[in-house]
């Protein structure tokens, strides 16, 4: 039997502010369903992803900003970071695991010199403080 993650729910404080942020991040709006007061579902999908995110009203009791350590993988971290910064999104500096082969939680500034998959990353947060890590993964070399 196979399993796949379909949707992750993010707790947010203001649906419209979050919607604008994730659209600026490049996510496509799949659903914006608001059948009654107090209930709204917004679902978005990152480009190229099989998994979506959702947020809204009446979906979760979790506090806004409590979804931490979410990952988005990109084929070129420097290019992705530059594009997001140009769109007005605050993205932390790029860092990489060191040493990669025996990594124990230490980082060095910049991209991994060998551009190994899963070694380089940069962080960002949505307006509520839900955190994301952009991680460089070249699918050609990760296989």
Q: Model-found features: residue ranges?
A:
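Generic signal for short, ordered secondary-structure residues
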Residues: 1, 63, 107-108
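Core segments of cupin and vicinal oxygen chelate
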Residues: 2-3, 9-51, 79, 86
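Conserved short beta-strand elements that form part of the metal-binding/catalytic scaffold
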Residues: 28-67, 74, 92-93, 116-117, ...
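Hydrophobic alpha-helical segments, principally membrane-spanning helices and signal/leader peptides
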Residues: 11, 61, 110-111
């Amino acid at each position: 039997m196979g399993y796949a993650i379909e949707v992750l729910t993010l707790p947010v404080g203001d649906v419209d502010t979050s919607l604008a942020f994730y659209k600026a991040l490049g996510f496509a709006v799949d659903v914006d369903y608001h059948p009654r007061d107090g209930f709204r579902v917004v679902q978005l999908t990152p480009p190229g992803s099989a998994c979506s995110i959702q947020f809204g009203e009446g979906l979760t009791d979790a506090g806004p900003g409590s979804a931490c350590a979410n990952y988005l993988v990109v084929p070129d971290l420097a290019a992705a970071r530059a594009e997001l910064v140009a769109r007005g999104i605050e993205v932390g500096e790029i860092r990489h695991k060191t040493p990669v082969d025996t990594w124990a939680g230490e980082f060095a500034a910049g991209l991994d010199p060998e551009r190994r998959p899963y070694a380089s990353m940069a962080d960002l947060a949505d307006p509520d403080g839900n955190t994301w890590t952009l991680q460089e993964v070249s699918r050609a070399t990760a296989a």
